[in-house]
Amino acid sequence: MSISTSLNSASIHLSSMDTHPQLHSLTRQPHSSSTAMSKNEAQESSPSLPASSSSSTSASASASSKNSSKNPSSWDPQDDLLLRHLKEVKKMGWKDISQYFPNRTPNACQFRWRRLKSGNLKSNKTALIDINTYTGPLKITHGDETANAQQKPSKKVEENVLTEDTAEFTTTSSIPIPSRKTSLPSFHASMSFSQSPSNVTPTTIVSNAASSMPFAPPTLPAALPHHPHQHLHHHPHHKTLKPRSNSHSFTNSLNQDPIVRSNDEEKYGFIPKVFVRSRRSSFAYPQQVAITTTPSSPNSSHVLLSSKSRRGSLANWSRRSSFNVSSNNTSRRSSMILAPNSVSNIFNVNNSGSNTASTSNTNSRRESVIKKEFQQRLNNLSNSGGPTSNNGPIFPNSYTFMDLPHSSSVSSSSTLHKSKRGSFSGHSMKSSCNPTNLWSKDEDALLMENKKRNLSVMELSILLPQRTEVEIQWRLNALSSDADMLSPTHSPQKTLSKKTCPRMFKSGSTTDDDKGSDKEDVMGDGSNDDDEDNVDPLHRAKQSSNKTVFSSSSSNISSKDVSPDPIFSPDPADDSSNTSDAGSRCTITSDTSSSAATMNRTPNSKNPQDIALLNNFRSEAITPRPKPSSTTTSITTETTNNMINHSSSTTTTTNNSPLPSINTIFKDML
């Protein structure tokens, strides 16, 4: 210790100058010659000097001279190790630590330590050492090793010596004997940290140079290049890391590869920045609004995800928001409209009911099936060129995207009815069935066909979600009361079923009767029962061929449907598809059977509760209309029920041969 303190005043002065860049810049030129001389002296004496006060003095002098020549902030790797040991292991105060570094002020020591911890000294491998796990006895010899390192002719020689010096380093004297040899026997004497501030002083010079070396444990400082300060000047890139980048984490051992260390330092170094970005991410969230405005934001979000976490979070927002935007802005209706392109394109013009399209979202699959059938039948109807009904949309308002203007042809309405028949989409009938809204002809046609489908009121309520079972029952009763006129005579213009049903093919007089019956049907009036009585049997016979066609199509549709969707054959007599579903369906004959009979289900009805409800409602709400045979409406509910049951049973039997069975049924009913 006394030896280290015996450094000449000039060397001390120079070392102190090193700590101050300005002073150093002022004094650097005058001392350059002296520093070179001191270096030469150190080199000359290095091979022969024993571990003695003279050797330590020369080493310290050379170190101090180097300090003067080097950046004032330069530290010897051994000084760095000692500094870290004193601060991190012994938890000493900066003022006490500065005593081990006579040329360093407490602030200089603190600044150096911060730079080491921050990873800003990327090239300095002492920063890579985990001082807590450092095995070599940290001794003030680090400064000595610095001198040795300074005397090393080249990095390569030093690197070769590093491993050898490691063991020696632990025992090296506090002030290394200036020698280029890798082994530093002189160091062994004072390897113990004498911890005199003077011992470390010379070491401060070599800190950066040591870092450039693959810094094996403490031995590396001894192996540092002869002119570490030159090395620093020639390798400015070693300080590419920004200060504070690694200040928070230094756990790597000194043995760790500097490259690996630098990578880790970079990772750690970015952590504070990442935190900064994360703090900004709070501002990034408001940006989601802008992102949501652009549906293409999901693409940008992918780009953002590749970047930092704040952008990733922002990208997540943009992704979700864009999805929400598409769903919110265009509304579910648009997506539903887009689903069946062909159908939606056909009905783009008909958006009057589009505001209610959301109701159709639930059954998109079924609707798609409906739309397929609907498209086919629409084409067929367009080819047939049936008369147009200004009142009925092809689809109820629930199929808003499918709705046609009221000016749409009856064929379109019948097509709607067919599409409805093809599936259990209660949405199609729902809007039209609202009691507040007059029953649409589509709904009436559906109910009329339900007579043949033998659908229960519950099933009808599913088909007509906007209508309650009571309403449907009432309407069925009304239609059944008017069925005589409605089923055969209901003009295609008035009802979709007319168009789809063979009834459409009836004579003009029959259609006239049907028109009147339509009006009366809505009113629940049965004044045209006689006309229907006249029409039904013949009309049934006429429709037999048509009904077979529709029944086959309807049966196909029913097979497609996930649930036993009621197949609404355009023909009132179309019972083929109804046969399979008759058990669960209310026997609804579009024929003269009263609405009560219509509400009545087949004896094998799967829903006895529905049957009871229908019977009660029928008995309470409406007197069943007489069949065409009876001009009076006084036919009892039981009679109509029996007739309907018979007709339904015959219908079931007639699924295979719908025409003769229907005719027979009507004859029986008449």
From Swiss-Prot:
CDD domains, A to Z: SANT
Compositional bias per record (Basic and acidic residues), positions renumbered to this chain: 512-522
Regions of compositional bias (Polar residues) in chain numbering: 1-44, 425-436, 599-608
Keyword terms, alphabetized: DNA-binding, Nucleus, Phosphoprotein, Transcription, Transcription regulation
Sequence ranges assigned to domain HTH myb-type in this UniProt record: 67-121
Sequence positions bearing Phosphoserine: S245, S247, S487, S491
Low complexity compositional bias, start-end: 45-74, 295-307, 316-332, 544-561, 587-598, 622-659
Gene Ontology biological process terms from the UniProt entry: rDNA heterochromatin formation; regulation of transcription by RNA polymerase II; subtelomeric heterochromatin formation
GO molecular-function term, one example from the UniProt record: sequence-specific DNA binding
PROSITE patterns linked to this entry: HTH_MYB
Any Gene Ontology CC annotation: Rpd3L-Expanded complex
Residues recorded with modification Phosphothreonine: T489
DNA-binding feature ranges: 94-117
Location in or out of the cell: Nucleus
Gene3D superfamilies noted in UniProt: Homeodomain-like (1.10.10.60)
Sequence similarity: Belongs to the DOT6 family.
UniProt function note: Component of the RPD3 histone deacetylase complex RPD3C(L) responsible for the deacetylation of lysine residues on the N-terminal part of the core histones (H2A, H2B, H3 and H4). Histone deacetylation gives a tag for epigenetic repression and plays an important role in transcriptional regulation, cell cycle progression and developmental events. DOT6 binds to sequences containing the core CGATG, which resembles the PAC (Polymerase A and C) motif.
Note: Present with 2120 molecules/cell in log phase SD medium.
Subunit structure: Component of the RPD3C(L) complex composed of at least ASH1, CTI6, DEP1, DOT6, PHO23, RPD3, RXT2, RXT3, SAP30, SDS3, SIN3, TOD6; UME1 and UME6.
UniProt name for this protein: Transcriptional regulatory protein DOT6
Lineage, highest ranks first: Eukaryota, Fungi, Dikarya, Ascomycota, Saccharomycotina
Name of the gene: DOT6
